[in-house]
């Protein structure tokens, strides 16, 4: 009879040990998932800060260009440039509200058309820069969204 109790107690101990090992494995996998979620949140936070910095820089550049055109006499060409700059400013402001931006598709700007409004020197500088910035922002928005 003592042998039956020893076997029963041994079986209970073995099953309790197996359950504790299984619980440990589950808690480790849950901890891994939580660590991955935390690192993703950190990456999103860094991406958000970079995007915010780029947005601020672009807003500043657009405001500077707008103020430059305000101080000169407005001709039809300048008026078009101002309209485009205002559209860019609205698009940059929409980055503050991603839920609204995701509802509507972001507009693509015809880089050649914008670049033709500037002189050749400005064209050589701004054309590639606007293209790179547009591609970078598009890539970041896709990754974040």
Swiss-Prot record:
Keywords tagged on the record: Amidation, Amphibian defense peptide, Antibiotic, Antimicrobial, Cleavage on pair of basic residues, Cytolysis, Fungicide, Hemolysis, Secreted, Signal
InterPro entries for this protein: Bombinin
Modified residues (Isoleucine amide): 144
Tissues showing expression: Expressed by the skin glands.
GO cellular component terms, A-Z: extracellular region
GO biological process: defense response to bacterium; defense response to fungus; killing of cells of another organism
Cellular compartment(s): Secreted
Signal peptide (UniProt feature, chain positions): 1-18
Record Pfam families: Bombinin (PF05298)
Proregion span(s): 19-43, 74-124
Function: Maximin-3 shows antibacterial activity against both Gram-positive and Gram-negative bacteria. It also shows antimicrobial activity against the fungus C.albicans, but not against A.flavus nor P.uticale. It has little hemolytic activity. It possess a significant cytotoxicity against tumor cell lines. It possess a significant anti-HIV activity. It shows high spermicidal activity. Maximin-H3 shows antibacterial activity against both Gram-positive and Gram-negative bacteria. It also shows antimicrobial activity against the fungus C.albicans. Shows strong hemolytic activity.
Family: Belongs to the bombinin family.
Identification of the protein by name: Maximins 3/H3 type 1
Organism annotation: Bombina maxima
